[in-house]
Curated annotation (Swiss-Prot):
GO CC terms, sorted: cytosol; endosome membrane; fungal-type vacuole membrane; PAS complex; phagophore; phagophore assembly site membrane
UniProt biased composition (Polar residues): 162-171, 405-421
InterPro entries: PROPPIN, WD40/YVTN_repeat-like_dom_sf, WD40_repeat_dom_sf, WD40_rpt
Species for this entry: Meyerozyma guilliermondii (strain ATCC 6260 / CBS 566 / DSM 6381 / JCM 1539 / NBRC 10279 / NRRL Y-324) (Yeast)
Designated name of the protein: Autophagy-related protein 18
Function: The PI(3,5)P2 regulatory complex regulates both the synthesis and turnover of phosphatidylinositol 3,5-bisphosphate (PtdIns(3,5)P2). Necessary for proper vacuole morphology. Plays an important role in osmotically-induced vacuole fragmentation. Required for cytoplasm to vacuole transport (Cvt) vesicle formation, pexophagy and starvation-induced autophagy. Involved in correct ATG9 trafficking to the pre-autophagosomal structure. Might also be involved in premeiotic DNA replication.
Low complexity composition-biased segments: 188-198
Membrane topology: Peripheral membrane protein
WD repeat segments: 19-57, 268-308, 313-352, 464-508, 518-558
Short sequence motif L/FRRG motif: positions: 309-313
Encoding gene (name): ATG18
Listed Gly residues bias regions: 175-187
Length: 568
């Protein structure tokens, strides 16, 4: 039986309603976030997110370590943990859940770390190889040799095909024509005809994975005419930038799975990567390093760095980064138990007056800044640190319209004390208080908020007298919204996705008040009101789904709307 609970008020005092009866070995969303696949010690299960319902349960069998769906079709890829006799973590099975049949199976030379599916490709990641298959015929198209990647870090963009993705996992999608089998990494011979899963003629699917920590790899790509970190720079500049950082391990290779050729190398971080994600249309790449303090967003076509956000001050393990379907937000989860939401591409009018002035002067003074700060840049880039001082790294020079760092992302709590009736700094628009969850208020949080506010005010005063590179240290771009996962367990891993469709939900009236106008009585706390929210779905390794509401106008603290348990 499925266990579910609507969050009580205040929401963050809720406790998990039931401990799942079976260990969760693997949990993930499908490509559009409409379903959740869970692998456990008895098999695997599939749930829909809205509404939360179990729509498929596999027959009891071997423990499953990986389960991946193709949108909401009946095609499922599973890999066993290999704990039972006859099962192996090197064996991949493609299953038609509607027919209950195995379409084909493939055996690889080493343990399978990750599987990714698009409408046209299947990507199988091993420790030192990546296999690319045509999903309609299961023909091996290409093999990529990589550096050791035990963390299984890779990302793929969903090609823009015309597959019907209804919310029913029982929808066969015309995938599979009956049982078939194969063995060996390149011997898949099953024919999986599909009338509605053929990608559009202009669709593109990109694969992103860590670059080997060798300059020879970059040099070979340059010889082949591949861009490294931007198409606007010359090969000489690219080679110089690589040779100056021979120990870089945070670069990302973008690979075109249609042409089967590398597209570019993006210099994302100096330290090792912890998580990467491609937007569904393949235009943007988000990255986080193992330092866990900085999140960056790049243009895939040019390699230019478009956004840089401060996730936190102290290092932590980042579990996942994900784009919203409309590319307006980036969602990150980490070992701290906090989920951060960063906003992309807000209107220029949301920028503060000082940021606009610096942006307008950037092209005029870039030559002087480069000359004046070259020595400092070299020192900072040589230290290998990706924490606080990493903000001083030079940004790629791109048009201001393309970058558009959002004012709302600068600090969710900056205007909390001003009230909704306060005017913006330029006197044109009223400030809107971000949502505040009073259950999350603590002395440490208030002190941190005050120090950030003072820091931003100091940066605004000094910004006109400092080059933009130095000003970015004092005035980092922070999250637009955040939430604290309501799990009682520690060391819980999590992943999250954000739905870009606005939903009207009933929430406590207390969330409409500013800090100074917080409701004083329990009766006021229980009163409900309707709010237009975006839903954030968070799943945790202890077997729970949390649904939070994000106010797209105010940001701030997200509201816990639902809590469900995978009773498997």
């Amino acid at each position: 039986m499925l266990k579910s609970q609507i969050a009580p008020i205040p929401s963050y005092e809720s406790q998990p309603v039931h401990k799942p009866s079976s260990s969760v070995n693997f949990i993930t969303f499908n490509q559009d976030g409409s379903c959740i696949a869970v692998g456990n010690n008895k098999g695997y299960s599939i749930f829909t997110t809205n509404p939360f319902t179990k729509c498929y349960d596999s027959p009891p069998g071997e423990a499953i370590g990986i389960v991946e769906m193709l949108y909401s079709t009946s095609l499922v890829v599973v890999v066993a943990l290999g704990e039972e006799t006859g099962s192996s973590p090197r064996k991949l099975k493609i299953i038609n859940t509607k027919r209950g049949s195995t379409i084909c199976d493939l055996v690889f030379p080493s343990t399978i770390l990750k599987v990714k599916l698009t409408r046209s490709r299947m990507i199988v990641l091993l420790e030192e190889q990546i296999y690319l298959y045509d999903i309609s015929t299961m023909k091996l198209l290409h093999t990529i040799e990589t550096s050791p990647n035990m963390a299984g870090i890779c990302a793929i963009s969903a090609d823009q095909g015309s597959t019907d993705t209804s919310n029913s996992a029982d929808n066969s999608g015309s995938i599979g024509s009956g049982p078939a089998s194969g063995s060996g990494a390149g011997s898949g011979s099953a024919s999986m005809t599909s009338t509605d899963s053929t990608p559009d003629a202009q669709s593109h699917s990109y694969l992103a994975y860590p670059s080997p920590p060798k300059t020879a790899m970059h040099d070979s790509l340059l010889v082949a005419g591949i861009n490294t970190n931007g198409g606007s720079h010359s090969k000489q500049n690219n080679i110089q930038s690589v040779s100056n950082a021979p120990n870089r391990v945070g670069d990302v290779i973008i690979f075109d799975t249609d042409s089967l050729q590398p597209l570019c190398v993006i210099e994302a971080h100096k330290s090792a990567l912890a998580a990467i994600s491609l937007s569904s249309d393949g235009r943007l790449l988000a990255t986080a390093s193992d330092k866990g303090t900085i999140v960056r967003v790049f243009s895939v076509s040019t390699g230019a760095k478009l956004y840089q956000f401060r996730r936190g001050t102290y290092p932590t393990k980042v579990y996942s980064v994900a784009f919203s379907p409309d590319n307006r937000y980036v969602v990150t989860t980490s070992a701290s138990g906090t989920v951060h939401i960063f906003r992309l591409g807000e209107d220029e009018s949301l920028e503060s007056k000082h940021k606009r002035k610096r942006a307008s002067r950037q092209h005029e003074t870039i030559a002087e800044e480069t000359s004046a700060t070259q020595d400092l840049d070299d020192e900072i880039e040589d230290d290998g640190d990706d924490s606080d001082v990493d903000d001083v790294e030079s940004l790629e020079v791109v048009p201001s319209k393309q970058r558009k760092l959002s004012q709302g992302s600068s600090n969710s709590y900056t205007s909390m004390n001003s009230g909704i009736s306060g005017m913006s700094e330029d006197g044109k628009e009223p400030k809107i208080d971000p949502i505040v969850d009073h259950a999350r208020l603590s002395v440490a949080r208030m002190i941190r908020r005050s120090s950030q506010t003072l820091g931003r005010k100091a940066a605004q005063k000094m910004g006109d007298f400092l080059p933009s590179k130095f000003a970015s240290i004092l005035e980092p771009t922070r999250h637009f919204a955040s939430l604290k996962i309501a799990s009682a367990s520690k060391d819980v891993k999590s992943i999250a996705v954000l739905d870009s469709q606005v939903v009207h939900d009933m929430v406590p009236q207390m969330f409409l008040h500013s800090k100074d106008a917080a409701p004083a009585s329990a009766l006021d706390t229980q009163s409900m009101t309707e709010m237009a929210l975006l839903h954030i779905f968070v799943v945790t390794s202890d077997g729970y789904l949390y649904v939070y509401g994000l106010d797209p106008e105010r940001g701030g603290d997200c509201i816990l709307l639902q809590q469900h348990s995978f009773d498997i």
